[in-house]
Amino acid sequence: MIEVKNLVKKYGNHLAVDHLNFTIEEGHIYGFLGPNGAGKSTTMNIMTGYLGATEGEVLINGHDILKEPEEAKKQIGYLPELPPLYMDMTVREYMEFAAELKKIPKAKRAESIDDVEKLVKIKDVEKRLIKNLSKGYRQRVGLAQAV
């Protein structure tokens, strides 16, 4: 479960997010819609720990993303619209890099990567450089690192 409580983000005098409250229940699919400049990206960046809040809290399965970022981030995966891929890495190298960042134990890393690559159907391209993949395959690689 993700709980957003009284979330506020200010950039100087500009109020980007104004006392936002909502709950995301596990096992459901939600849409996050609004016009340009409504604060959607800012909210998502706060929820995933990429940006700090001015006020409020974001709890991910009870862990505050601002106070316990490592514990909270273990609970979620996030795929931005344009995933930050390293184009000069092979798919496998990138997956190993992502697994290391997520602190997946070395003993479980290879099996975990294999499972995810099969799940998102990128196993057959794991030796290719990311820069040589189609946009669709790059999106799959981004999804794989989020899982």
Language-model features, listed with the residues they occupy:
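ABC transporter nucleotide-binding domains
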Residues: 2-4, 9-147
